[in-house]
Design a protein with these regions (language model features):
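Surface beta-strand/loop "capping" patches
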Residues: 171-201, 284-289, 582-591
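Substrate-binding/catalytic cleft of secreted carbohydrate-active enzymes
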Residues: 335-580, 586-591
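N-terminal carbohydrate-binding accessory modules
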Residues: 180-181, 255-328, 582, 587-589
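Conserved, mostly hydrophobic/aromatic
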Residues: 28, 102, 167, 252, ...
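Beta-strand-rich binding/interaction modules
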Residues: 98-100, 189-224, 232
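Signal that preferentially marks extracellular ectodomain short beta-strand elements
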Residues: 117-121, 233-249, 532
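Accessory beta-strand-rich segments of carbohydrate-active enzymes
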Residues: 4, 12-15, 29-34, 61-176, ...
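Accessory carbohydrate-binding/adhesion or oligomerization-edge regions at the termini
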Residues: 1-58, 133, 137-141, 213-215, ...
Length: 592
């Protein structure tokens, strides 16, 4: 990648699209200082949206707690006149303040969620200056940070900070659509569209059109069907009822608009949705299974951490993302567990289009972890400790001692659902992983079911299981696998992780994994043996979801199916496909 490139130029928000769009990705000026004040001198250029810690940014420097990362660039307003001009950030890690032409236009905290500022009043007619100041405490704070650490090694990776998703401008009408909530109902064969405008309370008329394959199949042009709260429900005709599934990921196109007065002010946005239904129900033998559209489905997938060697959280291109996801699908997988990270919106859009199901982790945070307890001791003594209660007495051990930390998690959970709920690919929320920052898991399940009643919840992936949610979620790297059906559906939500550092591909400083192969042939053989001799027999014992560790190598971890650079598949691809076909056939026979 060269600094002259314009990275990630694609429209960043496919589920709420307008024709007006101008990317601000590219070269910005930067400086790292000890002060929040505008620096007197810039240190050089940084390629946005790559964090300064990454090679792709051209900087290669780690932001320390207490330091300020400053960005600066000039820009012209989007083409057109009138209305409002919005400045969007896909994600900035962690806290930032934004100025335009010396005017503070807003601030934000939270490193994984999009935010927007109306900068109209701060704009000049032609030349404008944008300044962003960022702080990121990484492990010194309680905020969501995932696998980031200032001391990387093993299963934890280099910290990154600042802008790591697309920055962009758009021109909108005065009373524009701020948010669009699309709620499909599989059983009723309807879709309810709700729009919130920038100036609520007025006599805004909402209209919506649904198309399937370019053909208009349902529409409402502001008739009495439109509610006064800005919502409209449309019926999907029987002949155009196409359920979404991995084998047939059909997406309906949706256009939504508003009019006001005598159509003097209006907005039009484009989106999409799918009709699909998640549930847990007994199979023909009475064993609980995950069901998609009322049919048992084996969820066969991979743990996906979403790291790239040059950009860490940020991919080299949209094409690289699509290629990886397509290859995963071609290998016979239908599930990705998005682990300790929230991706840019386009990643979920591609999963929607390709038919890849996503189990979405809440990004872990809290006070510094006592890894000797939550990771190492519990992993080894899992039979004794995996159901340890996450009550107030243990909040210190689980890194949620402070009220501020717990309140931060509550805000982050709601922000995650708000940002991602429109994506059909997401089938399950995972509020906690292996006790990292876990507290009151039962309350988290209740909150998620209230915010989003149409999806499943894996209360505590691995441990500490409180007996709630929809999933009996097991991690197993070391013990013989003995499962049995119960009142929740059984998932092996982490396992495998066989390491092999493939020669010629990003050699690690240290090799990390769960058992090490010495060659491609050995890796392929061990993978096949694990899947067919250990995992497959457990299907009859209720096993309904598999999450092998992992998609790709990441830093020291060399237990991926792909190399870190995504240039090679480490085991024999034909063998992986054959194994997945065998698992699917065995599951179909088991549930009959």
């Amino acid at each position: 990648m060269t600094k002259t490139q314009h990275p990630l130029p694609e429209y960043p928000r496919p589920a709420l699209r307008r024709d007006s769009f101008e990317s601000l990705n590219g070269l910005w000026q930067f400086a790292i200082t000890k002060s929040a004040q505008l620096p007197r001198q810039w240190e050089g250029d940084i390629l946005v949206p790559y964090s300064p810690e990454t090679r792709a940014s051209g900087v290669g420097r780690t932001l320390q707690p207490g330091e300020w990362l400053h960005y600066h660039r000039s820009f012209a307003p989007p083409a057109g006149s009138g209305g409002r001009v919005l400045l969007h950030f896909g994600a900035v890690d962690y806290a930032c303040a934004v100025q335009v032409n010396g005017h503070l236009v807003g601030g934000h905290r939270g490193g994984y969620w999009p935010f927007t500022f109306d900068i109209t009043e701060a704009l000049n007619a032609d030349h404008n200056r944008l300044w962003v100041a960022v702080q990121d405490p990484t492990g010194a704070g309680v905020q969501a940070r995932g696998k980031q650490t200032l001391r990387p090694g093993g299963m934890f990776y280099p910290a990154q900070s600042g802008i790591w998703q697309t920055v962009w401008l758009e021109r909108v009408p005065d009373n524009y659509i701020e948010t669009l909530t699309v709620t499909p109902d599989y059983d009723a064969r309807t879709v309810t569209v709700r729009a919130r405008t920038a100036k609520p309370g007025g006599a805004v008329n909402l209209w919506a059109v649904v198309r399937a394959g370019g053909v208009t199949i349902a529409e409402d042009w502001g008739s009495d069907e439109a509610d006064r709260d800005g919502a409209v429900t449309l019926n999907i005709p029987e002949e155009h009822f196409f359920p979404w599934s991995p084998d047939s990921p059909f997406l309906y196109d949706l256009t939504v608009g508003t009019t006001q007065g005598e159509e003097e002010s209006f907005d039009t946005v484009h989106s999409y949705f799918a009709l699909r239904k998640w549930s847990c129900a007994p199979d023909a033998k009475g064993v609980l299974r995950f069901c998609l559209n009322d049919r048992p489905l084996l969820l066969n997938g991979l743990l996906d951490q979403g790291y790239w060697p040059e950009g860490l959280y940020t991919p080299p291109s949209d094409a690289a993302v699509v290629h990886e996801l397509q290859t995963i699908k071609e290998l016979g997988f239908n599930l990705l567990r998005k682990h300790a990270k929230i991706e840019p919106q386009r990643w979920y859009y591609h999963c929607d289009k390709l038919g890849l199901i996503v189990w979405q982790d809440m990004v872990n945070g809290g006070e510094p972890y006592r890894l000797w307890f939550v990771t190492y001791l519990t992993n080894v003594l899992q039979p004794l400790l995996r159901k340890l209660p996450d009550t107030a007495a243990l909040r210190g051990l689980l890194s949620r001692r402070s009220e501020a930390s717990r309140e931060e998690y509550g805000r982050e959970l709601e922000a995650t659902v708000e940002a991602l709920r429109g994506h059909p690919c997401i089938g399950c929320w995972v509020p906690f992983n292996e006790g990292w920052g876990q507290f009151d898991a039962a309350q988290a399940v209740e909150t998620l079911h209230t915010l989003d009643p149409d999806r499943l919840v894996d209360e505590a992936s691995g441990w500490y299981d409180q007996g709630g949610g929809d999933v009996d979620s097991r991690h197993n790297y070391f013990y013989p696998l003995h499962l049995r059906p119960g009142r929740r559906t059984v998932a092996l939500s982490e396992y495998g992780g066989i390491a092999w550092p493939m020669p010629g591909h990003e050699p690690p400083r240290r090799t990390y994994g769960y058992g090490t192969a010495k060659s491609r042939a050995e890796l392929t053989g061990r993978y096949r043996k694990l899947q067919l001799e250990t995992v497959l027999p457990q299907l009859r014992n209720g096993l309904s979801a598999l999450v092998y560790t992992q998609v790709s190598d990441v830093e020291d971890e060399v237990n991926g199916l792909f190399t870190y650079d995504r240039a090679a598949i480490k085991p024999d691809p034909a063998a992986v496909r054959a194994v997945n076909q065998a698992l699917e056939a065995a599951f179909e026979k088991t549930v009959e």
